[in-house]
Regions:
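N-terminal Rossmann-like NAD(P) cofactor-binding module of classical short-chain dehydrogenase/reductase
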Residues: 17, 121, 138-141
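NAD(P)H dinucleotide-binding glycine-rich loop of Rossmann-like/cofactor-binding domains
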Residues: 15-80
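Glycine-rich beta-strand-centered segment in the early N-terminal region that forms part
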Residues: 1-23
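Mid-domain Rossmann-like dinucleotide-binding core that forms the NAD(H)/NADP(H) cofactor-binding site
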Residues: 54-125, 131
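Short glycine-/small-residue-rich Rossmann-like dinucleotide-binding loops
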Residues: 4, 125, 144-145
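Short, structured coil segments at secondary-structure junctions
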Residues: 35, 115-116, 135
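Glycine-rich phosphate-binding loop and adjacent beta-alpha segment
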Residues: 110, 143-150
């Protein structure tokens, strides 16, 4: 194993996870060459199981949001915004400059507000199908599925 000469933030032996589209060649190989921008260190004292538990929802959200080709200021409804995938999508969407409109249970409002969400609908007590269209949305990121968005 080796690290490219221009790469300054990784050393041989670092525990890492990486992003690579499933369609890319090499994700099942024992060794591959990958761009350092697609790699993140696994924090010390973090098991590979724990790292995978963070990486999978994060990368699922990242890949889905990238496919939108959304523009700064556009609005995305993230249904189930406080769940594993939903919270990662919420944070990434905000970093991308999107306005997040979230649905969540009331117990999750505070954590979503601290993350920067300004519009939250309680899907347990409010008819979000009536509330949200008034705000106008450009995209829907559904982490709940089933009958909920019909």
């Amino acid at each position: 194993m080796e690290v490219g000469s221009a790469v300054k933030n990784f050393d041989v032996g670092d525990q890492v996870f990486f992003y690579r589209k499933f369609s890319d060649i090499g994700t099942w190989a024992e060794e591959i060459t990958i761009n350092a921008l697609d790699v993140a260190k696994i924090p010390a004292n973090t098991s590979t199981e724990e790292a995978g538990g963070v990486a999978l929802p994060l990368l699922t959200s990242y890949d889905a949001l990238q496919q939108l080709n959304a523009k700064v200021g556009e609005k995305v409804l993230i249904h189930g915004a406080a769940g594993g995938v939903g919270f990662q999508a919420t944070q990434l969407a905000i970093k991308m400059g999107l306005e997040v409109i979230a649905t969540a249970g009331e117990r999750d409002f505070e954590v979503l507000q601290k993350a920067g969400v300004k519009s939250i609908t309680n899907y347990k007590t409010q008819d979000f199908a009536q509330e949200i269209p008034q705000q106008g949305i450009d995209y829907v990121f559904d982490t709940v599925g089933g009958e909920v968005l019909k």
